[in-house]
UniProtKB/Swiss-Prot annotation:
TM ranges: 215-231
Residues modified by glycosylation: N79, N275, N343, N344, N379, N517, N569, N574
Main location, first listed in the record: membrane
Gene Ontology CC entries for this record: peroxisomal membrane
Quaternary structure annotation from Swiss-Prot or TrEMBL: Interacts with MYO2.
UniProt name for this protein: Inheritance of peroxisomes protein 2
Topology within the bilayer: Single-pass membrane protein
Membership in a protein family: Belongs to the INP2 family.
Job of this protein: Required for peroxisome inheritance. Acts as the peroxisome-specific receptor for the myosin V motor MYO2.
InterPro entries in UniProt: INP2
Subcellular location: Peroxisome membrane
Alphabetical UniProt keywords: Glycoprotein, Membrane, Peroxisome, Receptor, Transmembrane, Transmembrane helix
């Protein structure tokens, strides 16, 4: 045989099906093809010419060494241009047909879909939107997962790094274009090959009488090889599509979570800027209006873009969903269908409404993906849900009627094409939100340098105020103290840093001017500031009228005490009133003293200004809030105890008066009857717990008399 002669039609059973290249085709293979890379789904195209065909050489110009490689799983390794004839030995004359057939049909193409759909649903259910609390703890790790596709395939493990021409594999004709991007051509149609093989085997069984003839064995082996290749190619195609679908869904869910987190941060920042006047009297951001407008534009742009994108792709997804399952998932995850209809058909202008409808539509899209019809049960659909969907999406019924017959692989390909467009929009929105991230962490020093002109300041003091700068010095010292690692002790370097900061603060404070008159103090009347219950606005507190200013108390001044005679009843009532207001007066003096110190040290002026909560950390705010709540709770508890004690003594006095009236005792007789050793006003009653003893003693005295 010469070197330029073509090989024979059949050198070994079945080898010519996947080892020979047809030189008659000039532009490559033009049947159904698949392309695989890390970002794009495999596309199945028919009778189309790819632009990278021009880089391939003609099969007649290829050498056998450039086509056949050892990493190809189904090609017989050979460095010769032709295959030598194979002689069947006696050991292979009686081989086991059952073992061969079982190995051929071991990997069923349709079994991949069910395994994939379980992982598909699990990834969506454990996402950030449907399982907010525990999504980070419910990651799925399987030994046999769709995501292990690259690990399980010997061919994909050994992909050459550069472009190579066509290689024949059991998955189809393979070409590596660039950056390990694979192009597959599926040259066996699964269904047509199975049907044709079944018909041929039926005819052979009917007309072939010699069951052990060599020719019959060659034909059967040829048919089995064709069936095996068609099964492998269909299995590979379905497996690859499921893998790319799950990969794209996870990327979309991750991008949705990132965008949702950024939108939430911007929304919180927007609320802080808008409501800062209700939290504090001091505004730390001089360009708050400009920042609020930028944040609002970002939120409106992001919410509107994502909402209308979801509104355009959901009608294409919901036609593949089972309406019965969709209604169950909507009920499970709290999606109100009338509310969905309202937000999808009406125009929303406020920002909160835009964010709410976006969140609602994202959850509904995930419910549609969870309820994909994998069994083709169109007769078991929910009529009420279908009618509602027809109202929400006017062309829903028309799309359902135009939908092709049940084909899960085709459904996944359509879903992935829709999610690819959504993922590109999410990436754009995320980039835009990240570009303006500095607004989330804007401080007064940063915002003041960004503006060239001075703006009207809503603060009662300017940014150049000496007290404000001193507070910033203290804040830096506090941060340095918190940064010290106390486990290793305070080092000399840490000590020097703190001392330098303190010296700078002392120098600054000495050079600054003392402004304002701090000698005047004000005292709030306790009669006008009685706390009637628990006030909800803890940060703001209750407002009380200011009393006129008084002079400072002199401790050296002599105080004259006047003795006043009083009766028994009057003394008892006065003692009760003194006990009732004793604690409260003490608290008022303490609070007045603290307010006085606060005015002197913090402001240096007459008016009392509340501390700035924006300069405090989360732990400090939480600590101040807890202290305020505990203080108010203690005041309420003490007030209730004083009121209960006063009522109890009032009942005691009424019982004593009624007993004297009932028996008609005069003054001396009453004294003899009750055998009182001293007046009741002189009896020291420490608390309410002593009242039952008084009742019991009076009862005993009454029985003895």
């Amino acid at each position: 045989m010469t070197t330029n002669s073509r090989p024979s039609a059949l050198q070994a059973p079945g080898l010519q099906i996947f080892s020979m290249l047809k030189s008659s085709e000039e532009d490559g293979f033009m049947s159904s093809s698949l392309t695989l890379d890390s970002d794009n789904i495999i596309g199945v195209t028919e009778n189309n010419r790819q632009e990278f065909y021009s880089t391939w050489r003609k099969p007649s110009l290829l050498s056998s060494r450039s086509v056949l490689h050892e990493y190809s799983p189904t090609i017989v390794g050979s460095n010769d241009s032709t295959f030598s004839p194979i002689t069947v030995g006696k050991t292979t004359k009686f081989f086991n047909w059952d073992d061969i057939i079982s190995r051929i049909f071991m990997q069923q193409p349709f079994g991949v879909t069910h395994q994939f759909f379980e992982e598909f649903r699990y990834s969506i259910i454990t996402s950030h939107f449907l399982n907010d609390m525990n999504h980070y703890r419910l990651s799925l790790h399987l030994d046999q997962s769709i995501m292990n596709f690259h690990k399980s395939s010997t061919l994909l493990k050994n992909v050459p790094p550069k472009s190579v021409p066509f290689m024949a594999t059991k998955y189809g004709k393979l070409a590596v274009v660039e950056d390990k991007k694979l192009y597959f051509r599926q040259n066996f149609n699964y269904l047509s090959m199975i049907i044709t093989s079944y018909r041929v085997l039926t005819q052979l069984k009917k007309y072939c009488r010699r069951k052990n003839s060599p020719g019959l064995k060659r034909v059967v082996i040829l048919i089995l090889v064709a069936v095996y290749l068609s099964i492998q190619q269909e299995y590979f195609r379905r497996h690859l599509i499921c893998y790319k679908t799950l990969l794209k869904v996870r990327k979309v869910l991750e991008s949705l979570q990132q965008v949702d987190v950024m939108i939430h941060k911007y929304h919180l920042r927007f609320k802080e800027i808008k409501n800062h006047s209700f939290i504090s009297r001091v505004s730390l951001i001089s360009i708050a209006d400009e920042h609020s407008s930028v944040i609002k534009e970002l939120l409106v742009f992001s919410s509107d873009a994502l909402f209308y994108k979801l509104k355009s792709i959901i009608p294409d997804i919901v036609i593949f969903s089972d309406t019965s399952e969709l209604s169950k998932y909507c009920e499970l995850y709290g999606i109100d269908v009338p509310n969905l209809y309202y937000n999808n058909t009406t125009t929303v202008k406020d920002l909160d409404g835009k964010l709410y409808r976006l969140k609602l539509l994202k959850k509904f899209m995930l419910c549609c993906l969870l309820s994909l019809d994998m069994a083709g049960n169109e007769n078991l659909s929910n009529v009420n849900m279908r009618n509602a969907l027809n109202k929400i999406f006017p062309d829903y019924m028309a799309r359902v009627q135009l939908k092709k017959k049940y084909n899960p692989i085709g459904t996944f390909q359509n879903i992935v094409s829709l999610l690819r467009g959504l993922h590109s929009l999410l990436s754009t929105v995320l980039v835009s939100l990240n570009d303006h991230k500095q607004i989330l962490y804007a401080f007064p020093e940063e915002t003041s340098t960004n503006t060239g002109c001075e703006r009207a300041n809503v603060c009662s003091f300017s940014k150049n105020d000496k007290l404000f700068q001193a507070l910033n010095y203290l804040k830096m010292i506090e941060n340095n103290l918190l940064a010290i690692d106390i486990r290793n002790g305070i080092t000399e370097n840490d000590r020097n840093i703190i001392e330098d900061k303190l010296e700078e603060l002392i120098t600054f404070w000495k050079t600054s001017k003392i402004c304002g008159n701090i000698s005047r103090i004000q005292k709030v009347s306790p009669t006008n500031t009685i706390n009637h219950g628990f006030h909800l606005d803890i940060l703001k507190g209750r407002k009380s009228p200011r009393s006129s200013s008084v002079q400072g108390l002199s401790l050296e001044r002599k105080v004259d005490f006047i003795d006043v005679a009083e009766s028994v009843n009057d003394s008892f009532e006065n003692d009760t009133e003194l006990e009732e207001y004793e604690d409260y007066d003490c608290q008022e003096e303490c609070s007045a003293g603290s307010r006085q110190n606060h005015r002197v040290d913090f402001i240096g002026k007459d008016n009392c200004r509340k501390p700035d909560f924006k300069q405090l950390s989360d732990n400090e705010l939480r600590r101040k809030l807890d202290e305020r709540i505990l203080k108010l709770a203690q005041e309420n508890r003490e007030g209730r105890e004083r009121l209960r004690t006063a009522k109890s003594f009032e009942l005691l006095r009424k019982a004593q008066a009624s007993m004297s009236v009932k028996f008609g005792f005069q003054k001396p007789l009453r004294d003899d009857a009750f055998l009182e050793s001293r007046p009741l006003s002189k009896c020291k009653v420490s608390s309410e717990e002593t009242i039952p003893f008084l009742y019991e003693l009076k009862g005993l005295l009454g029985n003895d008399s």
